[in-house]
Amino acid sequence: MKFLVILVLLGAAVAFEDDDKIVGGFTCAKNAVPYQVSLNAGYHFCGGSLINSQWVVSAAHCYKSRIQVRLGEHNIALNEGTEQFIDSQKVIKHPNYNSRNLDNDIMLIKLSTTARLSANIQSVPLPSACASAGTNCLISGWGNTLSSGTNYPDLLQCLNAPILTDSQCSNSYPGEITKNMFCAGFLAGGKDSCQGDSGGPVVCNGQLQGVVSWGYGCAQRNYPGVYTKVCNFVTWIQSTISSN
């Protein structure tokens, strides 16, 4: 889910979303993204990433006090026999999360019971270092697949996209990019995360480098997706887990 802010300007409604979904991607192979989770409140509302058997990383803008975490999902409309549904025990937003500019848009969810890891449910490692521009990453989610209009898929969608340079990112969003954000995708448009993908993973070289956070529309030219820079939060993640 990308964060959606509606700006009404001269009678035109412009979507500035922080709710991400995949546009221009492809259906992931079944259970090929075993760390991907669906956050559910009677409906899918955000994605997340399993980082160990009892903790999930998502976006702070996805916060709800009670969340059911659905693991091992591929088709979220069917029970395929690989799923585990586990309620949250704790939901912890970053203490410096800013809902206005989406700085520090990261959140931890402690599961009420430990997930049983399997071929279909696996954790993803935290980054050992920040990823450089040009690194190709896998972005995934059940978010909207249309840049204009809505189509929410049942099957998990994947997108391969490169990390953009800091200058490309800041030029696309002047004054809006903090040190805790990076851009990934294609300045030409056509491929992006979108509403419903928010909180989900950006995995580069097998490590969780990003969390789907926000963007101006989806897959629009010169407006790439913006992601939380997980490498800046490894210490916070580790200390929060150890103290909870």
Curated annotation (Swiss-Prot):
This entry's Enzyme Commission designation comes to 3.4.21.4
Q: Which GO terms describe its biological process?
A: digestion; proteolysis
Q: What is this protein called?
A: Trypsin
Marked site, Required for specificity, at D192
List the PANTHER family hit by this protein, alphabetically.
RIKEN CDNA 2210010C04 GENE (PTHR24264:SF15), TRYPSIN-RELATED (PTHR24264)
Instruction: Give the propeptide positions.
Output: 16-21
- Gene Ontology terms for molecular function: metal ion binding; serine-type endopeptidase activity
Concerning its family, UniProt says: Belongs to the peptidase S1 family.
Q: Which reaction does it catalyse?
A: Preferential cleavage: Arg-|-Xaa, Lys-|-Xaa
Instruction: Kindly list the organism's lineage.
Output: Eukaryota, Metazoa, Chordata, Craniata, Vertebrata
